[in-house]
Amino acid sequence: MTLQSSGAISLANIASEFGGSAPHSLSEYYLGHSGIPSSGTISMNQFYGTSAPSYVAASGGSVSTSGVWKRHYFYSSGYFYISNAGNAAGSNSVYALIVAGGGGGTGVGGGGAGGYRYLNFGVGTGNYYVTVGGGGAGRYSNYNTTTGGSGGN
């Protein structure tokens, strides 16, 4: 919850928002974000309207973690559930790599490649349905007049 933007602010208010170990002192809150310095002079008024970093929390698909990054892979259709949308002090957006299945081939020829999109966008909490399709079916023919199938959603 964001700290108030006016009025009296106490060390207890700051500790409630940002955590820390008692006994509290301002020096434990060098944050380096939201206008709060990471070193040097720090004052109570620098905390007005600030909030602790919050990051997107989500579930769904097959999940793997690499460092601070969490990846959700969808091999079949299903829900991507966002339980925490994060905030500007942490992260409130997601990156998506969407790869489409290619078309089917004919005879001895290969099919066309699928397209892709790389996106970065803000999210809100809730369920997002992910549709996974497949590539097009190939066709065998002694003649090159039979085409392969189109890829699906």
What are these regions (language model features)?
Residues 2-153:
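Glycine-biased low-complexity/repetitive sequence motifs
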